[in-house]
Every structure is written in structure tokens, then in C-alpha cells.
Regions:
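Short, positively charged
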Residues: 1-24, 28-216
């Protein structure tokens, strides 16, 4: 409470889960009518030995609209997520060099806005995630240890975004996109062949983020 709201003790603050699809998982507030003063927290539970957890996902069309993705970049991503008549996808490292360059230029130019969209929420959203709480699950009894300070790490989202943007976007050897430090973009897959398997999925590496920010 002291870190998020700048106050000692709980005072009149309460916590609730947003009744919408906004980015925060938990809202802290002392005045239920003052929405703009609410502090949003995004929470990620992770196993240190597991590299990535989902940060955001949606259809290509949704991201084209929300992120202003250009036509050329959108077509490269379309070939990346949707199989052709032969059942094949074009991994990003298999796309023509000119298309790879266009895609990388776009994500480099708008890296911070995109990372913020993924982690903090839509630019026009009223409720945003102001903080990121990472909770380590080291054994089967992790739920009982949620309140143990040893296992959770709280960081201002602005610092998390800075951390991710400390590394430039690049295409991996596997043909996915590294959007920044600890963040990747890939095809969701799975879902029994449903259309949602073609969604774009942003994944975050909580371990890397924690290791970098804990040094600061």
C-alpha cells in the first residue's frame, strides 16, 4: 500500500477486481467515485524455471486497429499467423528481407507505445496498470505463500516498460519477434485448430524482468 498509494498502513483503502476487460487485475482505492485516482496492479504468477507467461493476446485485426499497424506489416504478420493452402506459415525470418526490414522498422519506431499497450493497457483506457506484481511459485503450496514478501516483487509499470525497451526489436532464429527485453510476439497456436489459434500473443519473461529491475 505504501509503495502503490504513498501511504502508511491500509487507511481507508480497499481493493477490488475490475468488472471489465481493462488491464489491471486489482484496483486500490479510497474513494469509489474517483476512478482516476485508483491505482491499478497487473499480477503475474510464474515459475522461475518457466521462461514466459502470456501478457496479451488478440486477433491480428484487433491489433491493426489498436496499434495502427501499416498494411505491409499487417500482411507479413498475416502470413506469419495464418497457414496457406499448403498448411504452411511464413515465419518472420523466412519473409523477404524487405518485409522483415519494414516490420522491424515499425516495431522499433513504436516500441514504447506497443509495450505500454501490452503491459499497461490501451492508450485511451480509463483504468491502466500502474504497477506490476510478480509472484514466484516455487512449490505446490505457493497459494499459501501469496502474502509472503519473499515471494513477490512489485515494480512501477513505467520502470518495467523502460526495462523492456532497453533492447531493440529483433527477429529470433525460430522466426518469432523479440519486441524488447523479456517480451516476444508469436502465434498463439493450440485451441484445437479453432480460429483463435491464429491470434497474436505477446509473452513476458517475468524472471528476466525481475532480475534486471532488482539490480537497480
Amino acid at each position: 500500500m505504501e509503495e502503490c498509494c504513498g501511504t502508511e498502513g491500509y487507511g481507508d483503502f480497499k481493493a477490488k477486481k475490475p468488472g471489465n476487460r481493462e488491464k489491471p487485475d486489482v484496483l486500490l482505492y479510497d474513494d469509489p467515485d474517483n476512478i482516476l485516482a485508483m491505482k491499478g496492479i497487473s499480477m503475474k504468477t510464474y515459475k522461475p524455471e518457466v521462461s514466459f507467461s502470456q501478457a496479451n493476446r488478440g486477433s491480428l485485426e484487433t491489433y491493426v486497429e489498436e496499434l495502427g499497424i501499416s498494411y505491409g506489416v499487417a500482411e507479413t504478420l498475416r502470413a506469419f499467423v495464418i497457414k496457406n493452402h499448403g498448411g504452411e506459415r511464413t515465419m518472420l525470418n523466412e519473409a523477404p528481407v524487405s518485409e522483415q526490414d519494414e516490420l522491424l522498422n515499425f516495431f522499433r519506431l513504436y516500441q514504447r507505445q506497443i509495450v505500454s499497450h501490452v503491459l499497461r493497457g490501451k492508450a485511451k483506457a480509463v483504468l491502466k496498470a500502474d504497477w506490476l506484481m510478480l509472484h514466484e511459485t516455487r512449490d505446490a503450496d505457493w497459494i499459501k505463500k501469496v502474502g509472503n514478501r519473499q515471494f513477490w516483487h512489485l515494480y512501477p509499470m513505467a520502470k518495467v516498460i523502460d526495462c523492456c525497451c532497453s533492447e531493440e526489436p529483433s527477429i529470433t532464429k525460430a522466426g518469432n519477434l523479440t519486441l524488447g527485453l523479456g517480451m516476444t510476439l508469436q502465434r498463439k497456436g493450440g485451441d484445437g485448430g479453432a480460429k483463435t489459434a491464429n491470434d497474436l500473443q505477446f509473452k513476458l519473461n517475468p524472471k528476466i524482468i525481475h532480475e534486471q529491475l532488482s539490480k537497480a
